[in-house]
Curated annotation (Swiss-Prot):
This is dTTP/UTP pyrophosphatase. The record marks 13, 71, 153 as: Important for substrate specificity. It comes from the Bacteria. GO terms for cellular component: cytoplasm. GO terms for molecular function: dTTP diphosphatase activity; UTP diphosphatase activity. Keywords: Cytoplasm, Hydrolase, Nucleotide metabolism. NCBIfam families: maf (TIGR00172). SUPFAM superfamilies: ITPase-like (SSF52972). It catalyses: dTTP + H2O = dTMP + diphosphate + H(+); UTP + H2O = UMP + diphosphate + H(+). Nucleoside triphosphate pyrophosphatase that hydrolyzes dTTP and UTP. May have a dual role in cell division arrest and in preventing the incorporation of modified nucleotides into cellular nucleic acids. It comes from Bacillus velezensis (strain DSM 23117 / BGSC 10A6 / LMG 26770 / FZB42). It is an enzyme of class 3 (hydrolase). InterPro entries: ITPase-like_fam, Maf-like. It holds the Pfam family Maf.
Length: 189
């Protein structure tokens, strides 16, 4: 018997990506507070957050298979969250301008008796950005709900010179790796 699949996320991007798999699922947003532990590496932090999100939803739905995910943008060993305002978005984009950074997405798939968590890292390189480029992009309001203040799947694609890794991981869910992991939980497309 196939268990009910739940995506523990309110991210519209993760929903779109999970829809690519053409498997039935429901959405229950996790209400966990996203706090980073300064004693952990970025990879460990993003994995912990993904596990916490999945675990919180699983606690209320013990007969389900739950997917939790989290994405971080890191540069110079520092993780950039979602900007709180336009000034913080501009600061983040200036830091990323003309440089490479890492986008780390962790996925945790959990049932009452099993947990699989994995991380996927993609290197993204930005074009050098002028102050006008930055301000025009901020005007779109696209940076405001995204880690690192950009969305590669939208107008933020114009900022990106190249990527080395999984495009879908940068968007928020490494689709192929997630599907392979779901097969281990007897969920198939």
């Amino acid at each position: 018997m196939t268990k009910r699949l739940i995506l523990a996320s309110q991210s519209p991007r993760r929903k779109e990506l999970l829809n690519l798999l053409q498997i039935p699922y429901s959405i229950i947003a996790s209400r966990t507070e996203e706090k980073l532990n300064r004693n952990l590496s970025p990879e460990e932090n993003v994995q912990c957050l993904a596990e916490q999100k999945a675990g919180a939803v699983l606690a209320e739905n013990p007969d389900a298979v739950v997917i939790g995910a989290d994405t971080m943008v890191c540069i110079d060993g520092e993780c950039l969250g979602k900007p709180h305002d336009r000034e913080e978005a501009a600061h983040m984009l200036r830091r990323l301008s003309g440089r490479s950074h890492q986008v780390i997405t962790a996925v945790s798939i959990q049932t009452h008796d099993r947990k699989e968590t994995f991380c996927d890292t993609t290197e993204v390189t930005f074009w050098p950005l002028s102050e006008d480029d930055i301000q025009l992009y901020i005007e779109t309001k696209e940076p405001m709900d995204k880690a690192g203040a950009y969305g590669i799947q939208g107008k933020g694609a114009l900022l990106v010179k190249k990527i080395d890794g999984d495009f879908y991981s940068v968007v928020g869910l490494p689709v192929a790796k997630t599907m392979r992991a779901l097969k281990e939980f007897n969920i198939k497309a």
